[in-house]
Swiss-Prot record:
This is Secreted RxLR effector protein 12. It comes from the Eukaryota. Its main location: secreted. GO terms for cellular component: extracellular region; host cell. Secreted effector that completely suppresses the host cell death induced by cell death-inducing proteins. Keywords: Secreted, Signal, Virulence. It comes from Plasmopara viticola. The RxLR-dEER motif acts to carry the protein into the host cell cytoplasm through binding to cell surface phosphatidylinositol-3-phosphate.
Length: 404
């Protein structure tokens, strides 16, 4: 600290010399002691400069020393403040020195990595350099996020996919893992996300769509449990948000896996569908479109949630020429997933099916509860727009637009 004080004093003397040289006066060098106090410096230094000429009023040296003393006096007043600044700088430097230093190599690696990431273009999910969605992400939805209406998602155009959906689905099943077993409806939804005729969407929007698809499946299972409880005259129980999140993440991980596989094989699945059909020995005629039409008439909720891998008979409604609905049977495969039963029900954050706002328009129309052997559903107080809410049981009606 004392060394810095001397340095500042020397700088002030040099500055005073330059000012004196500019004004035509020469600064004389005096050997004096260092004065620590501001007042002492302001009083003592001018007196020392004028000590030799007090009794000589007409001496030329008196005028010279008077000018010099004023300069020294101004500089002396600045010395204590400059000393405080130097001391503050030393304390800051000492504090910085005590902080742990980051390895220079790590800093360079992080800087180079950030620079490379900045130079890379932001690719959409439909670009050739496909970047899938990570399967490590979890979706912890709150109670308020569950107790909301499902937003309608973009519905694929049936006339565009009917001719080739069966061949695309068969090829997609071949490239998927054995435990996935995607349905035609799921294949059509993924095709819709990667369709180049639409405006390309980012991976973030695709992830939001997959979340909505998974949420639809969970709410479908929730309504099914409510319906089974009503038929058996059991007390309606609430499902915790944690249980809903558990099933939601199972469905979401399944959708993400199918999404990543479809994106990697997009060029061979949907860019040249006719070539895929010929390579598999199939056709792209009206028979494929008929198969898709039959599948789309089956509600999404017809899939079972049991662990058994057997087949079940599901019912679908068909409109005849006389206006009366006709019941027919279609064989469908079951999905393998964690059992979503009442045994995993708790009382924290209850979610009741009566709060679910469902409509017969859009994807949510296929969420009506299903039970094999009966084509009526229990609506209770649910807002289901399928013919009114006055009656306790309303027959299920398929939507006018095919649902994927």
């Amino acid at each position: 600290m004392r060394g810095a004080y001397y340095v500042i004093t020397a700088l002030l003397v040099v500055a005073s010399s330059e000012i004196s040289a500019d004004s035509g006066h020469q600064l004389q060098v005096y050997d004096h002691d260092v004065v620590a106090a501001e007042n002492a410096a302001a009083k003592t230094l001018p007196q020392r400069f004028l000590r030799g000429s007090r009794n000589v009023p007409d001496d030329l040296a008196h005028e010279e020393r008077a000018i010099t003393s004023e300069l020294v006096e101004e500089g002396a007043k600045l010395i204590p403040r400059a000393a405080e600044d130097v001391e503050e700088i030393s304390r800051v430097a000492e504090a910085v020195g005590k902080r742990p230093h980051v390895a220079e190599e790590d800093v360079l690696n992080k800087a180079s990595g950030a620079n490379e990431a900045f130079k890379k273009p932001r690719n959409t999910a439909t670009d050739d350099a496909f970047q899938g969605i990570t399967t490590k992400q979890l979706l912890p939805l709150s109670y308020k996020q569950w107790d909301t209406e499902i937003k309608s998602m973009r519905i694929p155009k049936p006339e565009k996919y009917q001719e080739n959906i069966q061949s695309v689905h068969d090829a997609f099943v071949d490239v998927c893992d054995e435990d996935l077993k995607p349905t035609i409806s799921e294949t059509a939804r993924l095709w819709n996300l990667f369709d180049r005729s639409f405006k390309p969407l980012t991976t973030r929007l695709h992830q939001h769509a997959l979340t909505q698809y998974a949420k639809e499946y969970v709410l479908r299972d929730e309504l099914r449990i409510e319906t089974e409880s009503a038929r058996s005259n059991e007390k309606t129980m609430s499902t915790s948000a944690s249980m809903l999140n558990l099933v939601l993440n199972w469905y979401f991980q399944r959708w993400v896996r199918m999404y990543n596989i479809f994106g990697k094989h997009r060029s061979e699945l949907i860019d040249t569908p006719s070539k895929v059909a010929r390579s598999r020995g199939g056709t792209t005629g009206t028979s494929r479109g008929t198969a898709l039409h039959k599948h789309l008439n089956v509600p999404l909720n017809a899939a079972s949630t049991s662990k058994d891998k057997s087949s079940v008979l599901t019912f679908k409604s068909q409109r005849t020429f006389d206006g009366n609905p006709k019941q027919s049977k279609v064989q469908n495969s079951e999905l393998v997933k964690p059992v979503f039963t009442k045994s995993a029900i708790s009382d924290d954050h209850p979610v009741f099916s009566k709060n679910l706002k469902l409509s017969s328009e859009g994807p949510s129309a296929a969420f009506a509860p299903y039970r094999s052997g009966d084509n009526s559903v229990s609506t209770k107080n649910s807002k289901v727009g399928v013919g009114g809410t006055n009656s306790a049981f309303v027959p299920y009606k398929p939507p006018s637009v095919p649902i994927f």
